[in-house]
C-alpha cells in the first residue's frame, strides 16, 4: 500500500475499508475486522477504481452499509454497495473532492471537503478548496470515537 486513505467501517463494525490513493494502485480494500481486538484480517480487493474516473480519497459509510468515496481529480463522489458494485455517482463543482462525512439533524446531508492546489487557476475552478453539502436519501451514522485503553 502506497497512500492509505478512505478508512471507514461497516455499520456492524466487522468490515474495515481502506483505499490506496496512489496512481499506481487505486484500489479499495476490505478487511474482516475483529471489534474486540481491533485486528484486521482477510484482506481483499473491494473495488478496483482504475477503470473509473478519479483516484480514491476520503470516504464514509451509510446505514445501508454502502461505501461513499471521493473521486479526486474527477469531481465525483461514488457510492458502492456492500458487494462492491457502483451504485451511483454525484458530481461536485470542483475537480478534487477530498473527504466526505454525513451530518445534519437527520444525518442525510453529505458534507464534502475539497483541495485547492497552490498552482490552480481559480478562473477554472473558483470553488476549489470549498466545502459542499449534498442532500441525499441515504443516511449516515455518527462516527465512533476512539477510546485508548
Please provide the spans of the model-predicted regions.
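Blade-level signature of beta-propeller repeat domains, shared across WD40, Kelch, NHL, RCC1
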Residues: 101-149
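Beta-rich, blade/repeat-based domains predominating
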Residues: 1-18, 27, 48-66, 94-108, ...
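Blade-edge beta-strand/turn elements of extracellular beta-propeller
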Residues: 1-3, 32-52, 79-92
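Short loop/turn segments immediately following beta-strands, especially the blade-tip
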Residues: 30-39, 135-141
Amino acid at each position: 500500500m502506497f497512500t492509505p486513505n478512505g478508512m471507514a467501517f461497516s455499520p456492524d463494525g466487522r468490515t474495515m475499508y481502506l483505499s490506496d490513493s496512489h496512481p499506481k494502485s487505486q484500489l479499495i480494500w476490505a478487511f474482516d475486522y475483529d471489534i474486540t481486538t481491533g485486528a484486521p484480517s482477510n484482506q481483499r480487493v473491494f473495488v478496483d477504481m482504475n477503470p473509473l474516473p478519479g483516484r480514491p480519497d476520503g470516504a464514509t459509510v451509510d446505514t445501508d452499509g454502502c461505501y461513499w468515496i471521493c473521486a479526486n481529480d474527477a469531481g465525483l463522489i461514488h457510492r458502492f454497495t456492500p458487494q462492491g458494485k457502483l451504485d451511483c455517482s454525484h458530481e461536485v463543482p470542483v475537480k478534487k473532492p477530498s473527504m466526505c462525512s454525513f451530518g445534519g439533524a437527520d444525518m442525510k446531508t453529505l458534507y464534502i471537503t475539497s483541495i485547492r492546489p497552490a498552482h490552480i487557476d481559480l478562473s477554472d475552478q473558483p470553488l476549489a478548496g470549498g466545502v459542499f453539502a449534498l442532500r441525499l436519501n441515504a443516511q449516515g451514522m455518527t462516527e465512533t470515537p476512539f477510546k485508548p485503553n
